[in-house]
């Protein structure tokens, strides 16, 4: 049974109903409708922490989706799952792929920055000051771009940039 038919969460049910109405009203191909259904089910599974199921749905959506912009969001969500699982190298791959298709995705830029910042913190713990500085500089570059695209977001990053002299 498709996930859309077994949602227990009110927000997921509402999203599913609205999405189904839009799919019926908007002129889209069967392939696009199927891709969106998989994407929607992936988002639902992801919101419930069912990451394996979410990935299966996202991979199927990727197989069907041809629009680069829409694919960017699928790739971004796959990156989120890998981040949640602590698979930062894989997450970075998906965030970069998302940005290749949609350079105006500040959340992907922010998540890349967060990973580089985390790696910088790890380098400090290992006594690798030079490496940590390079990683923090990389994080700063990505945060600056994210902030340029979404100036009212990422307040903590803005403060960190100012406090570290990287603004």
UniProtKB/Swiss-Prot annotation:
Essential for the assembly of the photosystem I (PSI) complex. May act as a chaperone-like factor to guide the assembly of the PSI subunits. Keywords: Chloroplast, Membrane, Photosynthesis, Plastid, Repeat, Thylakoid, TPR repeat. It is a peripheral membrane protein. SUPFAM superfamilies: TPR-like. NCBIfam families: PRK02603.1 (NF002725). Belongs to the Ycf3 family. GO terms for biological process: photosynthesis. InterPro entries: PSI_Ycf3_assembly, TPR-like_helical_dom_sf, TPR_rpt. It comes from Stigeoclonium helveticum. This is Photosystem I assembly protein Ycf3. The gene is ycf3. TPR repeats lie at residues 35-68, 72-105, 120-153. Its main location: plastid. GO terms for cellular component: chloroplast thylakoid membrane.
